[in-house]
Amino acid sequence: MAFQDLLGHAGDLWRFQILQTVFLSIFAVATYLHFMLENFTAFIPGHRCWVHILDNDTVSDNDTGALSQDALLRISIPLDSNMRPEKCRRFVHPQWQLLHLNGTFPNTSDADMEPCVDGWVYDRISFSSTIVTEWDLVCDSQSLTSVAKFVFMAGMMVGGILGGHLSDRFGRRFVLRWCYLQVAIVGTCAALAPTFLIYCSLRFLSGIAAMSLITNTIMLIAEWATHRFQAMGITLGMCPSGIAFMTLAGLAFAIRDWHILQLVVSVPYFVIFLTSSWLLESARWLIINNKPEEGLKELRKAAHRSGMKNARDTLTLEILKSTMKKELEAAQKKKPSLCEMLHMPNICKRISLLSFTRFANFMAYFGLNLHVQHLGNNVFLLQTLFGAVILLANCVAPWALKYMNRRASQMLLMFLLAICLLAIIFVPQEMQTLREVLATLGLGASALANTLAFAHGNEVIPTIIRARAMGINATFANIAGALAPLMMILSVYSPPLPWIIYGVFPFISGFAFLLLPETRNKPLFDTIQDEKNERKDPREPKQEDPRVEVTQF
């Protein structure tokens, strides 16, 4: 908590805080573009079996009697239960007798059929090329589209573990810059992948870097923020997701080839990597990790960028050591290991509850976000609506962070999310508008709850173990994200089953917030001792105290 007093010695850092937050937010937009990429690159177009008499260019009119395309389709492809051409079967031999039925429904159950042994013909109106058309991920292989989404989310799960550990050890800025370069390289290579296996491997590596980027971006913003800027800073760090999803819909609408789309969202990372050298390391992290000289250097840089010309006079090593005396003494001690953290009942309880609530929210969040094709016919419009409602939720977040209790607001939002998801089950496919409204409302509730959860998680965990704890939370969140696309495979057995799973978890997790402490308008904990002192003296800070009031700026 003494770090806030140290920032007071540095003067008003609002200019630096805004500039660094804006830079990180712009970079985060590029990161979020990768999250929902498979909504378009793995789009499943309409398809049917390739048949010789219909699709072979060498077949002449003499062979077919100049029959129309509809007639040739009728004798070559059987109809499914909805009287539409089958997607995965064809007649072994042309059924010429079907030409003379005059509109009656044919009985083709006795006709010999076979799978699409010669491949498929795809409807390329929506997309000229996707990974589905590239590697024929349809029919028996259609579940591989969920696998493609799963491997990216699995990479995010691993990134949540590695990112937190490496960030605590090497610093926020170093991990950020490394991950920018990693996404640039593996994302570009994914566009040129010759096989589905190589593509999935590269997307896995992209997921590792993407999660580390998001986690470290939020931490870097939060750890430089004064109390007055804390809520707005975290909110600005979350806004890029909505902007990115709307941007992705526009890019996918303009670029219908998955190779080019993959390149467009990956190549800019080379520029981001070069420009990220402007970012400053977290002075709070440096001081807490017993590097006061380096922390002082970063503080002076921040003060200079905010226009403070006398930073060297107002910020000295003596002032830093006297202000942060307790924190520096704590830094001399060995950091708690993961096993030691598990023996801290209160910290362990908080991490467990945060992890479960994040798991439930992310299961629903990605269940909606990764399956826009299951919710509406126009994936471009629905993705844009999703992005808009996420952005709106993030705009509402500063008000919610300032005026609403953390626990009550998150509990209500999770209940709303559960209701929307479970209601989708009872809305027929024909009522597309209502399904889209419910999905959009549910996603907005999930996005707002997610922003509040990031703030709440930062507020209940001390700085010295915050990155590690957030890494654990991110791991559970990304386990849910990885499982979300796999849940859709269960629709083969029962179409409502995935949506039941998506809806039940948020409902249960809503009650878990009652077990977490209320942290609105309270400063961040820097050490384990700060957290213990707060439990011994849990007095609410006065609202009029400018040091602890959370305002928009």
UniProtKB/Swiss-Prot annotation:
CDD domains: MFS_OAT. The chain crosses the membrane at residues 16-36, 144-164, 178-198, 204-224, 234-254, 260-280, 351-369, 379-399, 408-428, 437-457, 470-490, 496-516. It holds the Pfam family MFS_1. Residues 528-553 are annotated as: Disordered. Its main location: membrane. It catalyses: butanoate(out) + estrone 3-sulfate(in) = butanoate(in) + estrone 3-sulfate(out); propanoate(in) + estrone 3-sulfate(out) = propanoate(out) + estrone 3-sulfate(in); pentanoate(in) + estrone 3-sulfate(out) = pentanoate(out) + estrone 3-sulfate(in); dehydroepiandrosterone 3-sulfate(in) + butanoate(out) = dehydroepiandrosterone 3-sulfate(out) + butanoate(in). Belongs to the major facilitator (TC 2.A.1) superfamily. Organic cation transporter (TC 2.A.1.19) family. GO terms for molecular function: organic anion transmembrane transporter activity; short-chain fatty acid transmembrane transporter activity; sodium-independent organic anion transmembrane transporter activity. One of its GO terms (cellular component) is basolateral plasma membrane. Glycans are attached at residues 39, 56, 102. Residues 37-143, 199-203, 255-259, 370-378, 429-436, 491-495 are extracellular. This is Organic anion transporter 7. It is a multi-pass membrane protein. The lineage of its organism: Eukaryota, Metazoa, Chordata, Craniata, Vertebrata. Residues 1-15, 165-177, 225-233, 281-350, 400-407, 458-469, 517-553 are cytoplasmic. Sodium-independent organic anion transporter, exhibits high specificity for sulfated conjugates of xenobiotics and steroid hormones such as estrone 3-sulfate (E1S) and dehydroepiandrosterone sulfate (DHEAS). Can transport the statin pravastatin and may contribute to its disposition into the hepatocytes when the function of OATPs is compromised. It is specifically activated by 3 to 5 carbons-containing short-chain fatty acids/SCFAs, including propionate (propanoate), butyrate (butanoate) and valerate (pentanoate). It comes from Homo sapiens (Human). The keyword Protein biosynthesis does not apply. Specifically expressed in liver (also at protein level). Keywords: Cell membrane, Glycoprotein, Lipid transport, Membrane, Transmembrane, Transmembrane helix, Transport. One of its GO terms (biological process) is short-chain fatty acid transmembrane transport. It is found in: Basolateral cell membrane. It comes from the Eukaryota.
